Amino acid sequence: TKYADELLDFQNLDWPERVRTMQENWIGKSEGIEFSLKVSDQKNKSFRVFTTRPDTVFGMTFCVLAPEHELVNIITTNEQKNVVNDYIKASSRKNEIERTSETHEKTGVFTGAYAINPMNNESVPIWIADYVIASYGTGAIMAVPGHDERDFHFARKYNIPIKVVVVNPEQLNSIPNSSDLNGPILQKETSIMVNSQNFDGTAWPESFERVAEIISKKGVGERKINYRLHDWLISRQRMWGTPIPIVYCGTCGMKPVPYEQLPVLLPDDAEFKPTGESPLKFHEGFLKTTCPNCGGEAERETDTMDTFICSSWYYYAYLSPYWKKGETIAKKDIPWDMKKIKDLCPVDQYTGGIEHATMHLLYFRFFTKVLADLGLLDFREPTKKLFNQGMILGEDHEKMSKSRGNVINP
């Protein structure tokens, strides 16, 4: 996540627009404001929400917490306890992909509690819904059904009021009634605030600035940038990966394997069993070791690294296969011949499938930047040009894949 902004910079890169857009959406940079909503009748209880559309804040008619949000059990009324607890149990059986899928039916339940909109002091009901994820943003949202697709359908489903608070210029003389809407009014660039007290008539982007200023002056919020991107969880429960050089000691805790003992090598006699765990966990010769700190008994980490770790950098090492560990340049250990790297990199054109747009093609850009910051490369992008070669399709005109059963048996 530290490299998110730099990964959004495609300047001087000849990459397909579609891949650039996919990476931009994956990183998901959102500029907006984050502010607090106080819970009615709950002294000192509040929660934070983030919005990229502060100009629609007067249209908030409800707010939603993730089922896992820490406030849910505290603010839920006695009358709603059973239905809320049942909903939390049901949502816990769904994974994040299921919960956020566009095709997943949006469901939720009312907690019985209310929050106060700091811009107009109106009370809005607090719901929980599994399409809100606790680990993304604040784990809570302000819901503006008049100007958000998801909120609109949720409000119609549960008979929650809808307010129109921004319109397009051509709608100013005849502001739509919320009951006549077939969908939300989404246009941002030409939007003008209405039904918003003394903000009426304020156009975007001035509307963003004015509301953000008031929120800040009230002391309830501030400008903020959010990212959809999370840090990379690299551990995998598989045999054929790069070992993670960590040992666990009962006395000293978690310790890194000393540099002079690297690389940690995989055994060649592991036994594979249908346990769902890595064979390394049952290989005594690999598992048992000594603590580099105290010399006592210790165990190695048995998870290995994600395959994309290796494919993000090993092509640099391929340029100097006989380079030996310990060879140095300017008294610094270097894993490859820097002269060959300078002669041949960055790559002029990389040919790769678009299916890797948010995986390998993002990871190897990230790795190149990290290696440059470590002084191991003198450039920050791995390739100047990307060419997507397309897919081989089966007779059913779908991507040829084992999972689809449409491959040709050689």
What are the functions of these language-model segments?
Residues 34-45, 116-118, 134, 294-297:
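A short acidic-Thr-Gly-centered motif at the start of a beta-strand
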Residues 24-27, 102-107, 303-306, 403:
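Short Gly/Pro-enriched turn/cap motifs at secondary-structure boundaries
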Residues 86-112, 160-170, 198-212, 216-217, ...:
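Conserved catalytic alpha/beta cores of large enzymes that bind or transform nucleotide phosphates
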Residues 44, 57, 74, 86, ...:
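Long C-terminal interaction/binding lobes of large macromolecular proteins
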Residues 104-109, 238-239, 382-384:
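Short loop/turn motifs at secondary-structure junctions and domain boundaries
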Residues 113, 136-147, 153-167, 241-250, ...:
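Conserved active-site neighborhood of enzyme catalytic/cofactor-binding cores
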Residues 1-47, 54, 70, 140-263, ...:
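Residue patterns forming the tRNA-binding/recognition surfaces of aminoacyl-tRNA synthetases
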Residues 69-168, 185:
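Catalytic alpha/beta core of large soluble enzyme barrels
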